[in-house]
């Protein structure tokens, strides 16, 4: 049985000049992953075949969605439609949850 409780703050860890990802929960219809981006790291332009939601836990960065910059800061919530082009850049150590819905 999967553990039904996780303290996200305790799971946050940053790799020097890298990006860490940890699967928080995975079901047939929902994938939730914690991403921890070290300051200065980037995730290049890409798309997803699933609808997604990003919730920023801490840090500061830029989320580019369909050529529009959105500030990533604690509490920000970003909705991603299927096949939307997006990229990310961490201006500080930044952590967020990515939820993908099938």
PLM features: residue spans?
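A short, N-terminal "cap"/entry segment at the start of jelly-roll beta-barrel domains
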Residues: 1-29, 64
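Conserved short histidine dyad/triad with adjacent acidic residue
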Residues: 17-18, 33-48
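Histidine-centered metal-chelating micro-motifs
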Residues: 42-43, 77-78, 82-87
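Short beta-strand segments in beta-sandwich/barrel cores
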Residues: 42-43, 59-64
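Glycine- and acidic-residue-biased ligand/ion/polar-headgroup-sensing regions
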Residues: 50-61
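A cytosolic small-molecule/anion-sensing beta-strand core signal
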Residues: 57-58, 73-74, 92
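Short acidic-glycine-tyrosine-enriched beta hairpin
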Residues: 67-81
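Ligand-binding loop in jelly-roll beta-barrel domains
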Residues: 82-102
């Amino acid at each position: 049985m999967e553990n039904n409780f996780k303290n996200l703050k305790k799971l946050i860890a940053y790799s020097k000049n890298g990006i860490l990802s940890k699967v928080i929960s995975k079901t047939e219809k929902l994938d939730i992953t914690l991403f921890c981006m070290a300051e200065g790291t980037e995730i290049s332009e890409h798309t997803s075949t699933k609808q997604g939601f990003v919730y920023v836990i801490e840090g500061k960065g830029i989320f580019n969605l369909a050529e529009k910059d959105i500030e990533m800061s604690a509490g920000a919530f970003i909705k991603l439609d299927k096949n939307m082009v997006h990229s990310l850049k961490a201006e500080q150590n930044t952590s967020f949850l990515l939820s993908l819905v099938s």
